[in-house]
Amino acid sequence: MSVKRNKKVSVACVHCAKSHVTCDDNRPCTRCIRKGLEESCIDAPRKKVKYLRDVPEDQLPSVLRSTKQVPPVNAVKLKMEPGILPNIPLDYDGGTIRQSAPANNGKNNPETQQTLSNGQITHRPKFLSSAADLEYSILSDIIHGDSLFNKIPVNFLYSNPTEKTPSPINQGSLNGQQDLHFSLQLRSKPMNQIRGNTRAIYSNLLGPVSHEILQSEFNLYTNHFPLQPQESLDGTLDFKRMTIGTLSPHLTKFDKTINQYYLNFANTFPEIYDSRKIPNLSYALEVEPPEYREIPHDTEIPHTLRFTTPSEIYSLVQTAFPSTTGFHALLRYLKRRFDKNQLVEMCRCLAELRPIFIASTIDLTDEDMIFMEKSHQRTLLEYEKFISQVGTPTCVWRRNGQISYVNDEFSLLTGWNRLELLNKMTFIVELMDGDTVMEYFQTFTRVAYQGFRGAETMRICNLLTPIKGSVIKCCCLWTLKRDAFGLPMMIIGNFMPILTLPEDVGF
């Protein structure tokens, strides 16, 4: 005589799951009816994957939510009364939806599947992702000699990162009101106060044409203008405080004893102008307000940390990062700075990466590239909390060399503050001398796709400062972070200065 066993179900109720017993498809189930637990017999919540644990249930896409949703008790009572339920609209209270979603929300649309299937078959000979395809194309252009000097593609498949994303409400999303609420909160932040005045920051750091660049309508996030060290007569960074409209030292006198300019000219009070005072010997440390030291979270800056919470990252990042724009700008910058022989050596290093890049990205779709950007933003948000507590000068940049984050110690070491590096498209090679740039590409080749031990030290590392001719000799340790597909996502560089003692100092 065989024992009759209950049929297993995919989702058990909360009581059966807690007791680790077999449940059935009925709600309430047979066991809960027998124990008098009919009212609380609902499906047990499924365990979320690791990267979605921080996202609330109501902010997840419909395909990632539980397909079986039980409305609250109040909704069940209203449903029993005729003539009331059809007039109840969708109501958001405390971030939850009172009226349950349709039962077919979790099902796939056959038409969409057919479209996706056709797209995959069509793009099978090339990359499945337009972002990966375009990134590989510019990498090939850098490697080939003819295209290195003559051909630069100008048609991008990316949308402008500064354009506002359409509201999900128009697309019929149940989370449209919440996404709009997040967007309004981000746009209402006084970002100009944190980012400072762009004209004041770059008034004398973009070379002789700084004024023309700042007066034009160029976007500093998508157009690259390299930083240029300036002459400093006294060896200090006081010239960075000279903004547009500052009084000329030839017209008025500056008294160092009181740290002020004279408002009158020399012929007004000549006895005061000619008087010489012994300056008081005093020193002070300049400390910026906390809001100026914080990393600028701005949705309009594509290369740095754009959001402050994980839920904003997962719900509002809807496009892949335009790495191709950065590769184009990097190519133009290298062509202006180095000769042909040096460029050939750099291209030789990049040529070793091309076949491995193809094998790693040939099957990635646009959705995968968007997921990679979400992973980058989420990882950078976590690293920002950790790096801010460590006293080591640290700089984080993407695989195309664009700087994404610097801490206060890096600014103290190099003299480049955070606003100067993050308020525009800035590459890490801009802060290196010629020999260090050559070592940069060789180190990147060693750590990108070859046997990587977790950390790599650059053989040569000399950082440029805002003062022309001033170089800081450092020891640089690389730590490469890969994404879920094995591609280099970000590089964390730790810089420690190499201090040399004067020859006349002995022990």
From Swiss-Prot:
CDD domains: GAL4, PAS. The keyword Transcription regulation applies. Residues 97-121 have a biased composition (Polar residues). GO terms for molecular function: DNA-binding transcription factor activity, RNA polymerase II-specific; RNA polymerase II transcription regulatory region sequence-specific DNA binding; zinc ion binding. Residues 379-451 form the PAS domain. Residues 13-41 bind DNA. Residues 95-121 are annotated as: Disordered. It is found in: Nucleus. GO terms for cellular component: nucleus. Belongs to the ERT1/acuK family. This is Transcription activator of gluconeogenesis ERT1. The lineage of its organism: Eukaryota, Fungi, Dikarya, Ascomycota, Saccharomycotina. The gene is ERT1.
